């Protein structure tokens, strides 16, 4: 009898989802941090506090801190002699334990009413908006070398928006029920979590994505194993602590820093893998698909694979473009956060009649841009994330310098003696298929192709076919017919397409983010489209008065 009652209670918990409404979300306001403002003073204090000590970061498995003894350092990219933390890397034992913990926590978490799951993430948003705003911003600035504005729009505003909007979109999903229940029947849909656990693999470049990738599947009733980027463990650990303080039950999200290859290989060999939520390089994502494909016969269910990967994002100017607006978009789109945004502009197409004036405008703006430590708030550009990134970006600059098809027309300097600093660099090429027009660089490098203004349509075709990616892109024009032509011809060139604006800065609730082709599965983070990937619908029909005769009227 006890088991029967327990079963009924659990069933009712799952069905009793919509006797409430979550608060209607609004985008978190972006603070200015202007000189003399209280937020600026608070942030300066937070930076000073975090700079005082090197903290120790464990794995967090089933709510418990796990210190493995296999360690690495979190360093400041802008001053690589400064250590922020020492973190403990998960090995085979810890990875297996994280999987077991996620599986053990799954039933109770899935059965928790949606109201209570939502409340946890709404509380996390409130804590981040108030108590932890400046600490997480400071952690992102120091650990990932973001300037004050880039940290604010990322680790504060966007993550708060993810947590608030996700609960709202989830409610809208649960509200979707069959339109028809004929007389004597009741049709309804139950939205179940996936059977197994979800593996979240998060990047270094957006703290908000680090928080969203594990929490969005969790909101929908899934339990998660989370591997943060090794260069963003510092801010990731702080997010995990915020979620714990918000009431997240033990085992729902398990935080395991460590080797991506080792953790990934163990995870993809688990028969209980139900899904993967990924942001990172196309190369790594392809490897994940390959591993899943090779193991497809062992899984209990086909894993849901959701990924946002690389980009070779473009700005395309028509001869009717506003030159000042175009130049500002190029500087912000290409060089904010050192070009390390998935959406960053990396190639630009300029008509020959605009090029001289555009270049003059670019040089005037860039002459005022400074590069340096995040503690100096006057810098627009800071350091790239690590030595590997520095060397890779430098190799593209050196390749352009030695090529007969390209020339450096601005910048080109770099120095890693203190931090991993690379000057904003403009490369002009005569070949629209030049290497730096095709391959993702992920650094402060923008390549320009000057095209004959009479060949607008032909150059649009080149833009569409040059790169394997399809993430973001912009068209700059005042001529509406030109805008329409670009809109149509570049339909699959960008999952986020901007008209007279830079191709970066998607806002939750306004421009759901993601792209196709080699840029990912285009499941649009920050929207219901993404949340739907983390549920498995069950259609249920109840007949109140069942048929008592097998025969149909035509048989008489």
What are these regions (language model features)?
Residues 68-69, 73-76, 81-174, 460, ...:
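Glycine-rich loop-to-alpha-helix module at the N-terminal edge of alpha/beta enzyme cores
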Residues 242-247, 269-270, 275, 283-432, ...:
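ALDH superfamily catalytic-core signature
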Residues 141, 145, 170-325, 522:
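Rossmann-like NAD(P) dinucleotide-binding subdomain of oxidoreductase/dehydrogenase enzymes
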Residues 183, 224-227, 312-316, 343-347, ...:
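Short beta-alpha connecting loops at secondary-structure transitions
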Residues 9-84:
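Hydrophobic face of amphipathic alpha-helices that form TPR/SEL1-like repeat modules
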Residues 12-21, 28, 32, 78-87, ...:
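Conserved C-terminal structural/oligomerization subdomain of aldehyde/semialdehyde dehydrogenase
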């Amino acid at each position: 009898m006890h088991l029967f009652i327990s079963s009924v209670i659990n069933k009712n918990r799952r069905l009793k989802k919509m006797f409430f409404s979550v608060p209607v979300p609004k985008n978190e306001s972006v603070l200015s941090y202007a000189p003399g403002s209280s937020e600026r003073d608070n942030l300066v204090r937070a930076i000073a506090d975090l700079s005082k000590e090197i903290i120790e970061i464990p794995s967090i498995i089933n709510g418990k801190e796990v210190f493995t003894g296999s360690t690495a350092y979190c360093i400041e990219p802008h001053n690589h002699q400064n250590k922020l933390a020492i973190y403990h890397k998960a090995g085979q034992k810890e990875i297996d334990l994280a999987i077991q913990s996620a599986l053990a926590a799954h039933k109770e978490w899935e059965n928790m009413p949606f109201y209570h799951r939502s409340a946890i993430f709404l509380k996390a948003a409130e804590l981040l908006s108030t108590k932890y705003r400046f600490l997480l911003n400071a952690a992102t600035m120091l650990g990932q070398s973001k300037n004050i504005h880039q940290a604010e729009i990322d680790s504060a505003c966007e993550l708060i928006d993810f947590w608030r909007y996700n609960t709202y979109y989830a409610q809208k999903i649960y509200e979707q029920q069959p339109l028809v229940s004929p007389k004597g029947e009741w049709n309804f849909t139950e939205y179940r979590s996936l059977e197994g656990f979800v593996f979240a693999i998060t990047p270094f470049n957006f703290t908000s994505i680090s928080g969203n990738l594990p929490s969005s599947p969790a909101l929908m009733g899934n339990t998660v194993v989370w591997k943060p980027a090794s260069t963003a463990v510092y801010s990731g650990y702080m997010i995990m602590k915020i979620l714990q303080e918000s009431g997240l039950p033990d085992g729902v999200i398990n935080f395991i820093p460590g080797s991506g290859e080792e953790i990934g290989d163990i995870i993809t060999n688990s028969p209980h893998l139900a899904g993967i939520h990924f942001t990172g390089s196309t190369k790594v994502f392809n490897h994940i698909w390959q591993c899943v494909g090779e193991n497809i016969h062992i899984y209990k269910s086909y894993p849901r694979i959701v990924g946002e990967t690389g980009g070779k994002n473009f700005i395309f100017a028509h001869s009717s473009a506003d030159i000042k607006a175009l130049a500002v978009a190029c500087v912000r789109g290409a060089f904010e956060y050192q070009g390390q945004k998935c959406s960053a502009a990396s190639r630009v197409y300029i008509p020959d009649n605009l090029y001289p004036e555009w270049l003059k405008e670019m040089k005037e703006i860039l002459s005022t841009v400074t590069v340096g430590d995040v503690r100096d708030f006057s810098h627009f550009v800071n350091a790239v994330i690590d030595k590997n990134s520095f060397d890779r970006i430098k190799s593209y600059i050196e390749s352009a310098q030695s090529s007969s098809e390209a020339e450096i027309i601005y910048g080109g300097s770099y120095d890693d003696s203190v931090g991993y600093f690379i000057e904003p660099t403009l490369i002009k090429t005569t070949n629209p298929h030049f290497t730096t027009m095709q391959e993702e660089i992920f650094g402060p490098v923008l390549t320009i192709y000057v095209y004959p203004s009479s060949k607008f349509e032909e150059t649009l075709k080149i833009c569409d076919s040059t790169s394997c990616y399809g993430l973001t892109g912009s068209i700059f024009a005042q001529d509406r017919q030109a805008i329409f032509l670009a809109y149509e011809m570049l339909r699959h060139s960008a999952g986020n397409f901007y008209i007279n604006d830079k191709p970066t800065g998607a806002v939750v609730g306004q421009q759901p983010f993601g792209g196709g082709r080699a840029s990912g599965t285009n499941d649009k983070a920050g929207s219901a489209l993404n949340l739907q990937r983390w549920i498995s619908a069950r259609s249920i029909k109840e007949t109140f008065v069942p048929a008592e005769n097998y025969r149909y009227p035509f048989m008489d």
